[in-house]
Every structure is written in structure tokens, then in C-alpha cells.
Amino acid sequence: MSLWINGEWRPGRGPGFSKQDPVNLKVVWQGEAADAGQVAEAVAAARQAFPSWARLPFAARQAIVEKFAALLEASKAELTAVIGAETGKPRWEAAGEVTAMINKVAISVKAYHVRTGEQHSDLPDGAATLRHRPHGVLAVFGPYNFPGHLPNGHIVPALLAGNTVVFKPSELTPRSGEAVVKLWQQAGLPAGVLNLVQGGRETGEALSGQADIDGLLFTGSSTTGFHLHRQLAGQPQKILALEMGGNNPLIVDDPRDVDAVVHLTIQSAFITAGQRCTCARRLLVRRGEAGDAFLSRLVTVSQRLIPAAWDAEPQPFLGGLISEQAAQKVHQAWLQRVAAGAVTLLEPRLLQAGTSLLTPGIVDMSDVANVEDEEVFGPLLGVWRYDTFEEAIALANATRFGLSCGLISPEREKFDRLLLEARAGIVNWNKPLTGAASTAPFGGTGASGNHRPGAWYAADYCAWPMASLESPTLTLPASLSPGLDFLAGEAS
């Protein structure tokens, strides 16, 4: 039973597909995709459930969402294993993802009240009130790199606001999506409030093309995000929240504590096998002996990063990529850069045929002309050398993306300048690019997206504001506008 529609598990009528553990190649899920008719049924179920769900007191919706958080806590070990086996990420990282899902609930409840609750202002003759109302039926598209945490950042605030949801996980992580929905089912969500449709591109296009959805919340690649934007063009009545990729720069201007800088760089570039949208893709290093020493140390430490299975002991820093195809694609990107004139500082190696185990790669791109401005979603780091800080900022901004940017330097003045000139939604100073706080916005500008998903700021796009001028009584004003004449005794 692949799909959950209107409170019932049912098989899909679309093509069958399966997902393997990308390292040991064991099948972890198999089922069928939803066909277009079943997608329409899921949207219809969400539409039917919307009025009663939206009318529930907020406290009642909150209670169900908090029950979901409690079930996450109780099922943490099991869900960690599901996410780890399906994505290839190490146990410690999969467990951290589940913890982030749990923490998201309390933050989302607070964000609802602070950002989208009711606000009242007294007026001389009444009051002004700001309220927020749910959009209706929202489609949520989940990515594969954080198959629990990132969709959760859309679904939790959407449900708290009173929306109903049709959720399509990535076709590369169907088991994680199913496991999370089963916890929502146990939490007591009414039938139709949350629906699950599995499948790939055809299922996704059927969902985004549904006339009866009121919006679409997406986290994933820029290629897919741009396609969705085109598909929904001319429909301003629908909310479209896109959080996409990045070609993110990390500027190493003054690496004084070399090992600390190397550690930060590895955390920025290679965590999650480079499969975070905020990962550093471009390392900008000042020319000179200090930069040379830093790069030498970075290569030395990075070549010790040997990926292994999600449940390997001792636990590795890196697991596998999401699939063998993903690992091959990153390896091909390295070969293309070498063919274009890049100098390999650390060669990425495919460790075992048929698996997704890929070691990190580092290539010096300083002398390569006409570099394609695309996100390589994996552990491949390009290096560019520069002479002046002005040149570094220009290199950092030489991208159509605008997700994250970082500076390693003891000089606050340089960070202040970067804050003014960087074109990115996240700008960090002596902190990894991959670090994020749930109370801060997460997202970018340009080709990186148009909204800020996750907890605090997700509340903004999960409800629309309603303004009211209110008075319990109505009396004729003592002073009338020019041209109005109400003579006493004329009214009958």
C-alpha cells in the first residue's frame, strides 16, 4: 500500500518502483506510483477536509501536531534507521535529522502566534484587528537529502495554520515519506487532512497541475523549481514557495588557525556527502603562503574522509550519496572540469562499483575560463585564488544563485562590507555555510528561491493576512464629510 488518501492506505495505479540502500544495495521500499486520477482524489480529499480542519480551534490542531512530535521522539531509533538506510547518510546525521523534526514543532507553534496570530489595535471609534487565514489545500514536494526534516518544515506550519496537505516525497526516498505519514496517522489527523502520493515526475506534474490546489511548497533542485514556476505562471491566486539550490562561495581571507579553518571548510563542503543546498561549492582563497598552507592541510585532512555505510562502526563522517547515479554524476563533473583545464588537488574516487560511495574531490579552477554556473550536488569543491578582497566579493557574486555565502577572517570590517555587497540570503562569518538556526530565515535570492521554508518564517506563506476595522455599535458621526446633509426629522 503506497498511498495514503482520505485516511486510507491503498496501492498506486501507476508504475511500480523501488528504492535500494545506496551502499549495501538492499531493497528498502517497493510500491507503485500514484496515477493522475489518484492525485486528483488526494486533492479532492484534502479539499473536503479543509473546512472542518480550518474551523478547529488552534489548540486542537496544536495538540495533534504535538502528539506527532511525541511519536517522533518515541520512534527516533526506528526513523533514524529508515532515513539512514534510504539516503546513505551516517547514523549520527540521520538521528540529528529526526531531532530537528521534533524541535521544529515547538518553534512552529511559537512562530504561528508571533508572526501570524491575531493583533488588535484600539481606535477612537472601534478597533483594528489583524488575523490570518489558511490558504486551503497545499501541495508539498519533499527533497531526498533531508526527507523527514525539510518536508516537515512545510507540513507542520501548514497544518498549524489550518491548511490541508497533499505530500509528494522524492521518488528517491519513498520509505522515509511513508514512515513519517504513518506517525501523522497515529497522531490522530482526521481523514483527508494529510494525504500521501508517491511517484516521480509524472506524479509531481499531475499534482502541481491540479486546478484545485491553493499553493505549492517546494524544496529541491533549481531545475525542478523553475519548471514548477513556469507551470504555475499566470496563477497569482496560488502561493508558490520555492527553496532551491546554490553555487555557494566560502571566502578564506585570513586562515590563522589553519586546522580550525580546515574543519569549518570540511563542515561547509563535505557534510552529508556535499548534498546540502547550502554546501560550499566554490572556495575562494587569497593568494599567498598562508592560502597555500591552508589548501595543503585541507587536502591532507580531506583525503582521510572515507565514506562508509550508514550503520558502519566506528561511525564515518561521510556516508554514501543518494544513489549510484548521483555519485557517477559528481565524478563526471570532476572529469569535465579537468578536461576544461582544472588542476586536481584531491581526486574524487568511486570506492565500490554499483554503490554511491564517493570520496571528496578538490579542484583548482582559477585558470578555467567560462565555468558553468551550476550546482554540483555532491562532495566536489572548486577552488579559486584571488588577490584583493574586492576581487573575492566579485567572485562570490558571480553566480545566478544567492543562497549562502561565508567569510573566514578576523576582521569585522570585511564582514560588514560583505553584508552590504553579498547577494545571498545567508551570510555567515567564521561559521560553516551549512549551519542554520530554526529561528532565522533559511533561503536565498535569485535562482535559489523566493521564500524562507522551515519553522519561523514558513508561517508567513502558510496563511494570508486579513485586516478588519471593527465596532460593536453603529452611530451617525457627529461631524460629516463635506456634501453630506442629514437634516433632523427627515428620516422616516
Curated annotation (Swiss-Prot):
Matching NCBIfam families: arg_catab_astD, PRK09457.1
Reactions that this protein is recorded to catalyse: N-succinyl-L-glutamate 5-semialdehyde + NAD(+) + H2O = N-succinyl-L-glutamate + NADH + 2 H(+)
InterPro entries linked to this entry: Ald_DH/histidinol_DH, Ald_DH_C, Ald_DH_CS_CYS, Ald_DH_CS_GLU, Ald_DH_N, Aldehyde_DH_dom, Aldehyde_DH_Superfamily, SuccinylGlu_semiald_DH_AstD
Protein residues bound to NAD(+): 220-225
Keyword Ribonucleoprotein: no
Any one Gene Ontology BP term: arginine catabolic process to succinate
UniProt xrefs under SUPFAM superfamilies: ALDH-like
A GO term, aspect molecular function: succinylglutamate-semialdehyde dehydrogenase activity
Key words of the record: Arginine metabolism, NAD, Oxidoreductase
Positions annotated as active site in the UniProt record: 243, 277
Pathway info: Amino-acid degradation; L-arginine degradation via AST pathway; L-glutamate and succinate from L-arginine: step 4/5
Source lineage: Bacteria, Pseudomonadati, Pseudomonadota, Gammaproteobacteria, Enterobacterales
Protein name: N-succinylglutamate 5-semialdehyde dehydrogenase
Gene behind this protein: astD
